[in-house]
Amino acid sequence: MRKLDKVDIQLVKILSQNSRLTYRELAELMNTTRQRIARRITKLKKLGVIKKFTIIPDLDKLGYMYAFVLVKLRVPSEVDAMISEISNVEYVKEIEKGVGRYNLIVRLLLPKDLKEAEGIINEFLQKIKNAESVEVVLISEIKKFEII
């Protein structure tokens, strides 16, 4: 992968805060031209640095909450198989490999209704095979969320 410079990183940081800015607005913020911004964004997309432009919804207002499921597998080498097993589960929104106490960190999108959320969590936990330990953490409020 080609090395990114300070301008590329600054552009990604600005877009991660507001991806709706126009090329003109970005150019003004970065003291450059629209054409340079367009070329850099095209380059960043081709390199896979920018995967998509999206929004960050207010889950509380939509009636949802997050839960993190922290998993320590008995056989750490089976983490990729576990990822394949759970990747297509509808309410699984993020899967991360961990180094340290947990091999796997999974973010679930759950309804705020605790009975319904409990049912989904229990259903998900049935899919976790070969776990030495599992912890579930319900997220009551997100105080800060930044991508980069």
Curated annotation (Swiss-Prot):
Q: Which UniProt keywords apply?
A: DNA-binding, Transcription, Transcription regulation
Protein name as annotated: Uncharacterized HTH-type transcriptional regulator PYRAB00690
Which regions form coiled coils? Answer: none
InterPro entries xrefs: AsnC-type_HTH_dom, Dimeric_a/b-barrel, HTH-Siroheme_Decarb, Tscrpt_reg_AsnC-like, Tscrpt_reg_HTH_AsnC-type_CS, WH-like_DNA-bd_sf, WH_DNA-bd_sf
Which stretches are labeled DNA-binding? 23-42
What the entry lists under SMART domains is as follows: HTH_ASNC
Record the organism: Pyrococcus abyssi (strain GE5 / Orsay)
In the record, what terms sit under GO molecular function? sequence-specific DNA binding
Gene3D superfamilies per the UniProt record, alphabetical:
3.30.70.920, Winged helix-like DNA-binding domain superfamily/Winged helix DNA-binding domain
Question: Residue ranges of the HTH asnC-type domain?
Answer: 4-65
Q: Which Pfam families match?
A: HTH_24 (PF13412)
